[in-house]
Amino acid sequence: MPSVKLISMTQDPMEVLKTAAGMCYQKKATDKVIKHIIECGHLSVLEHCYATFEITCSVAVLLQLTRHRHLSFTCQSTRGSRLTSYYETGVHDVDCSVAEQMDFYNEACDNPDIPLEDAAYQIPKGAEYKLVVTGNFRAWFEYLPKRLCKRASKEHRLLAQMIYGMLYAKVPEVFSYVTLPCETCKESGCSFVKTKGKQE
């Protein structure tokens, strides 16, 4: 199961956002102005604030995270790191296979004849790794709808829900406007919600 810890955030983010937004009009912006800016899609103002999380997730989700732009990553090394846990899918054959691959990898790390960088090729995508991720508010604002979507993997959706909950608790003036674009989504064949895309 993924875990998330908020370790750093811009101090007094609304003050920063109002100051930045006010530059356009040469006067201090209000919460109402921030709301208007977000609703109009003028999200560049959100780039002046950031949030940093410590995350534990599978290699599979780590790879998905790196597809999102304007996030910065520092990851646990894959060279010589012993594996102790993995994301359990609930599918017996899959989970047993991942556990077996982890054992092979750990044994390879203890084998002096196998270079650690070569042993790393055996790491299963289900293995859990730790990383620190930093993104500005715009990056998180654009990340969340994509990974809160029911089409996202179960693990990544759970991770996104945790991140969203923490951001919403700290800055509801911004993150209450995160919405899922189900009615306008162009993905085809969604089995959860009728979208504008071609249906299967």
Regions found by a protein language model. Give the residues of each.
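Family-specific signature for flavin-dependent thymidylate synthase
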Residues: M1-E200
